[in-house]
Amino acid sequence: MRTSPYRPRGHQDGTLWTLRHAIGATVAVSAAVIALVTPTAAANAAPHNPSPSGGAAGQDTVTTHTGATTAQEQDRVNRYWTPERMKLAGALVPEITPVPEDDNTPDDPHPLPANTPDSGAVWTHGGAVEKNVGRLFFTFSDGYDGSCTATVVTSVNRSTVITAAHCLRGVGSPSVDDTWNHNFYFVPGYRNGTKPLGGFSVRTMATSSRWDTDPDTTESSDVAAAGYDAGLLVANSNAGGHPIEDVTGSQHIGFGEPVEGEFVHAFGYPAYGLNDPGDKYVGSRMIHCAGTSHPGPKVPLLWGETCDMSAGSSGGPHLAHFDTRTGIGTVVGVTTTNEELAGGQTPTLYATRLGDSAHRLYDWAQWCQ
């Protein structure tokens, strides 16, 4: 499917439908992916000089964009994202769309048994993942509000957040200001319209140059771009001057480790189910999937697990080596597309493998001050 005939729950990252239009928090059109990588601690994160990667034509460099850098702009963004606006992000017509109901699924104080398959249920087991994964809100160039999922990762500046490139800007669009989304606001641990750990505006962001240089709209170009669907953000400190990692903790991040056949956990804030498009999910709670990873039949660079998450889950982490007692693992990929693009079986949530290109973005982000 090349484009969705409607914006499912608005722009809540329609990403799970095609890279070019389903991106974001029910963004516009792309979906979910799972990238697989090797653990990398911030303490060992010296600048990386990767070898040229294959894929789209042209050199793979870092394309950056400035967000809220002044106190005035940061305050404006903070005031823009009211509890009601956050709940409605992704609604096609906010004026007549009812506010989604709260999800009051009770928490479970017991850790989830290791290697327990899950095709999509509210995460109730607490742990670090409930603090450093959250909902990333933004406004599209056409004025609609959308949301994706993002994760705080261990970094030198303690301010680095990873999501999908398509949550930041559309694939194939030129790198000019009006092609980027704006009003970026990350709420770690988002739950039923609340900000348990506060909200963080974004001061700068980056995607691979190979994400924006291909103007083609064919399926093959989407497949090529999928390998570069990672975006890095640098969050502003909170009102107390604390960097986000000091508030939320972080997940490890890894690059280049294949995980075929490994047990992987995926998290996200979907607005609806991939195979159950009703109100199975409403973006109010973090959803969890877990299972043995497998490559996409048509796109081996994409890996995924059985999962019913759809729009809104884009950018969410796929975690290897996940400890269900502590809620800590290693981000090896971020959700980017569904089985339609990858050629897998329904329902499968796919992520792009974090490789040299993502490592380059991460190095750029973690040294930003």
Specify the residue positions occupied by each region the protein language model found.
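Conserved catalytic-core segment of clan PA serine endopeptidases
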Residues: 119-142, 153-154, 178-242
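Terminal peptide-recognition signature
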Residues: 82, 136, 150, 159, ...
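C-terminal cap/linker of serine protease catalytic domains
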Residues: 332, 338-369
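Protease-domain processing segments flanking chymotrypsin-fold serine proteases, especially trypsin-like
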Residues: 2-4, 39-155, 369
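Catalytic histidine site
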Residues: 128-192, 287-297, 306
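Catalytic nucleophile loop of clan PA
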Residues: 308-334
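Chymotrypsin/trypsin-fold serine protease catalytic domain
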Residues: 226-230, 234-306
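Secretory targeting and sorting signals
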Residues: 1-47
